[in-house]
Amino acid sequence: MSLVTLQDIFQLGYPEYACTHPLPAHVRKAARAIMHGRTAVLGGHVHACPDGHISRIWYNACRHRSCPQCAFLQVERWLATQRARLLACAHSQVILTLPHDLHPLWREPVPRMTALVFQTVRDTLTTLLAEPTYLGAPPGIIAALHTWGQTLGLHPPLHGLVTGGGWTADGQWKAVRHGLLVPGRVAMALFRGTGLAALRTAWPRDALQLPEDLRPQAFLTRLHRLGHPQQTRWHVHRQERSPHGTGVATSLARSMRGGPLKNPRLVAWDGETVTFRYMENPTQAAEASGRQQQRTLPIGDFLQRVLQHVPPPGTQVVRSWGLSHARHADALPVCRTQLDQPPVVLPVRLDWQTVCAQRGDAHPAQCPLCGQLLVCTMVLPRGGVSPPASSPERAA
């Protein structure tokens, strides 16, 4: 288990980085959250055994979606709700990735490009699956976008969880008749055409802002080149169908919150450089085992890579369509009945103590000696002094 944490690196490396790099307000807010989450700065509570056996201090979470140690509760709550709603049918994961030539557009207002990508993927999947040749009915789709690759560079794939069937116009559940829900070459061609059409429509309407170093004529030339499949590929990766959607839903949940790098992937840092693990080819799970690599970056480059993935306020990175959308709430119970499933029973809102217990840890709110629940004896105000971060030598 790694001893170094992202919080350690930020506490010791971010203040100097912030002095020399102008950062947007939402990025500075994220950095402060990563540094202060579950420390005395945010206040906390003292809990003690009624019989005086032990007492514990629990500091408050920052609840920022880019913080890897404070986002787990929101992830587990979302995942519990989705598990309760999943249909008892096969599911497929589809990963759609824009060409690298479009990456500069992400440097401008991120919400605009995010909306355009979701629109493109929605139109691609719903149009394709509406064809009787492939399904002929709207399925349930949950899509999640994250903007990073394994080495923390800009790589914005959109992951979609698609049900292996859909809801027909005459009110019947229709299952996929063959193994491939989305045919690869057809999906790539439609993805390319839909994406280029969306870009050409958005730019004249000022719904898309070009970078300063990309002239309009150069942008149009780039779009023309992106329309040739021999020159540029619009990747559509289809993973093997799963008999249920729990595994893919869990993967989507992990990418929703917590930022691009979780603490277990950190290897070491010495105050000047950070070393972390990455998977060479994560989309090929069977081949990826044993292909774990390590990369070392200067602290400035590392912080820049992490912070570039902080989404601006209001950016929605998870969306639902078809049977998974709220507008089809009336159809979902009928589908469950036809699939011999009971009605949806939403879970009780999870608290962090329950989540810790579900992970197999000792229940944090129970006294390890007598088993009684700990009671709150003191509230610690915000603004306390956080303990110093681990030194680089100790963290390594």
Model-derived features: where do they sit?
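Beta->alpha loop/short-helix hinge microenvironment recognizer with preference
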Residues: 1-396
